[in-house]
A protein has these predicted regions:
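Patatin-like phospholipase
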Residues: 1-40, 48-259
Length: 259
C-alpha cells in the first residue's frame, strides 16, 4: 500500500461545497498540498476538479455561473425527478482527465450502491460518471448505472469520507459541511427533505470526525439551502476564513535553516 503524508477528506453538502474551495484556496496560498483526496457528493465534485489540475478560483467560475435549472432537466418516471444528463455533459466538457487513475492527485470517490445497500469507493474508472454517481440525490436525481449497478449519493453511507483514506495517510485534514445542528426547519417539502438529510449526515459522520487529525467545520454553513447558488461567493469566503483559523500551517513540513 502506498503511504501518503497528507490526506484531505471533503464532505458532501450540496451548495455548501463551495466552502471546500475556500479551504483549498487557503491551502494553496500557504503551500500545503494534499497527497490524496477523498470526496463525497459536493466534496467529490470539488475534490475531483482540484485533483484534475484546476485552481479553486477556476472551479468556482465553472460552477457558480450555472444554477440548478441549468444543470438538470425534468425526467418523469425514470427513477428520479430530474435527469443528470446536462450536468454530466458539463463535467465531461471541463475535465482534463477521463479516468480517476490518470489524475495528478490520487482521488477516492464515495457513492452508495443502491442495489446491494452499501458504500462503494471508486479509485479508478470513468471520472465524470463516478462523480455523478456520488452526488445523485435519491428521488431528486435518477441513479447512475455503472457496470449494471445503480449508484446514488454517497452521503447515505459516508458523507464525510475520512475513514476511506485514514489507513493510507500519516495525517488527515477533514472538512465537514454537515455539522450537528438543532436549528428550526420549515415544515415544507424542501424543509423536511433538507432536515432529513442533515440527520442522516449527523449519524454517519461521527466516527469520521473522531479520526481526523484536523477537523474543519462551522455551524454558519447550515443557513444555506441546498441549491442557493447566489450565495456561492459568500460560502467560499466562509470556507477560506475557516481554514485561516484552523492552524493547518502546523501540517507544513519543517524547513531546516540553511547555512
Amino acid at each position: 500500500m502506498i503511504r501518503y503524508k497528507i490526506g484531505l477528506a471533503l464532505s458532501g453538502g450540496s451548495i455548501k461545497g463551495f466552502a471546500h474551495l475556500g479551504v483549498l484556496q487557503y491551502m494553496d496560498e500557504i503551500g500545503l498540498k494534499p497527497d490524496i483526496i477523498a470526496g463525497t457528493s459536493a466534496g467529490a465534485i470539488m475534490g475531483a476538479f482540484y485533483a484534475d489540475g484546476y485552481s479553486p478560483k477556476e472551479i468556482f467560475e465553472i460552477f457558480s455561473s450555472v444554477g440548478f435549472r441549468g444543470m438538470t432537466s425534468l425526467l418523469p418516471k425514470r427513477g428520479g425527478m430530474f435527469s443528470t444528463k446536462n450536468f454530466m455533459e458539463r463535467l465531461k466538457t471541463y475535465l482534463h482527465h477521463q479516468n480517476i487513475e490518470e489524475l495528478p492527485i490520487p482521488l477516492r470517490i464515495v457513492a452508495t450502491d443502491l442495489d446491494n445497500g452499501c458504500q462503494h469507493v471508486f479509485s479508478e474508472g470513468a471520472l465524470a460518471e463516478r462523480i455523478m454517481a456520488s452526488c445523485s440525490v435519491p428521488v431528486l436525481f435518477q441513479p447512475v448505472v455503472i457496470d449494471r449497478v445503480s449508484y446514488v449519493d454517497g452521503g447515505l453511507f459516508r458523507n464525510f469520507p475520512v475513514t476511506v483514506i485514514r489507513e493510507e495517510c500519516d495525517k488527515v485534514i477533514g472538512v465537514n459541511l454537515g455539522p450537528e445542528t438543532f436549528r428550526r426547519y420549515k415544515k415544507t417539502i424542501r424543509g423536511v427533505a433538507e432536515r432529513s438529510w442533515q440527520l442522516v449526515f449527523r449519524q454517519n459522520t461521527r466516527i469520521d470526525k473522531e479520526v481526523c487529525d484536523l477537523l474543519l467545520e462551522t455551524f454558519k454553513v447550515t443557513k444555506y439551502g441546498m441549491f442557493e447558488v447566489s450565495s456561492a461567493a459568500e460560502i467560499m469566503a466562509l470556507g477560506y476564513r475557516m481554514a485561516q483559523r484552523s492552524g493547518m500551517e502546523h501540517f507544513l513540513p519543517i524547513q531546516l535553516p540553511t547555512e
